[in-house]
Amino acid sequence: MSAEIICVGTELLLGDILNGNAQFLAQQLAQLGIPHYYQTVVGDNPERLKQVIEIAISRAQILIFTGGLGPTPDDLTCETIADFFKTPLVENPEIIEDITQKFAQRGRVMSPSNRKQALIPQGAEILPNPTGTAPGIIWQPRPKITIFTFPGVPSEMHPMWEETAVPFLKSQGWGKEIIYSRSLKFWGIGESALAEKVSSYLKLPNPTVAPYAGKGEVRLRVSAKATSEAAAEDLIAPIEKQLKEIAGLDFYGVNNDTLASVVGELLRASKETLSVAESCTGGGLGQMLTEISGSSDYFWGGVISYDNSVKIKLLGVNQEDLDKFGAVSATVAEQMAIGVKTRLATTWGLSITGIAGPTGGTDTKPVGLVYVGLAGPKDEVTSFEYQFGTVRGRALIRHVSANAALDNLRRKLLTR
């Protein structure tokens, strides 16, 4: 038995809003141990929705709909489902009373159009909506087919799922096994290269291992099916250990870890401090660091030296080197790192200078060229060159540049 998630709404198809409901439901199904292999987004069109239902019932036994339960003419989910299964709609007086009271609490009178929300397929059970006017339903129109409908508003749908659908599914025997996953994170290695290194692990049945790409990083999702989270972790732990050993320094964290949080813990453990000097990232590196609660323990501040005059006045970058090598160069990156470390009196100084685009590139210095400078104890200084030209978009180049800088510091802290 498996489930299928069907999200209804033209606004989803047009990309006007993100489909957070599908993500939420996928995570919830995993926690209940219910497999699901398909997610569908369909616009507010009854004929296309019927086609989706026809396909869904051929491959899944639990159909979960979100959206299309409002009072407007394009909210057609319930009536389309009823029409597909050739079942009449009936007006439910409990829903009418609930909607009437909610309007009264706001000092308003229920609109006639809201009566539409009280029409549900004959034989369906109401799923109350504590906050909104659109109730859901649970309905078994055929043997071995169970349908849930929920409003598309996440703040309404999430509690309705947890308070009504989860208890029902558990009463049907689900939840005795769960699917639990851990996400291993890697920086400095491509998806194909990592997949090749761990290829034998990609064939495991339980836990399973699957690679996928993030924003400049690669992840391995390790998922286990077991009777409890603790039992799943016991299955995952030895595989996780082996994967970390294979990846070496390319592995940096799990689940919600970020390069900024990992670097922060390393600095805190060694009682060292960090300052940053940024050009093309415009404060993005400092923002990543200060998103971590308690980062003032090790992060002392930074300089956004976007203009060359700031590089000279605040960081002590040499004018002659700027003229000779340009602002985007290893020499200037190193001087920026030394300058911020010296002026803020920190253990480490980290700098970034580059061309984020889309303009500003040349034949010799194309868009995506980035230099990272790292100054540390005992006057040691080094620089790293990156070519992020294949990375699309200014924002993403800035993001991967900041993380690349953090990764260099992480590797230095781990290997000195």
From Swiss-Prot:
Gene3D superfamilies: 3.30.70.2860, CinA-like, MoaB/Mog-like domain. InterPro entries: CinA, CinA-like_C, CinA_C, CinA_KH, Competence-induced_CinA, MoaB/Mog-like_dom_sf, MoaB/Mog_dom. It holds the Pfam family CinA. Belongs to the CinA family. This is CinA-like protein. It comes from Nostoc punctiforme (strain ATCC 29133 / PCC 73102).
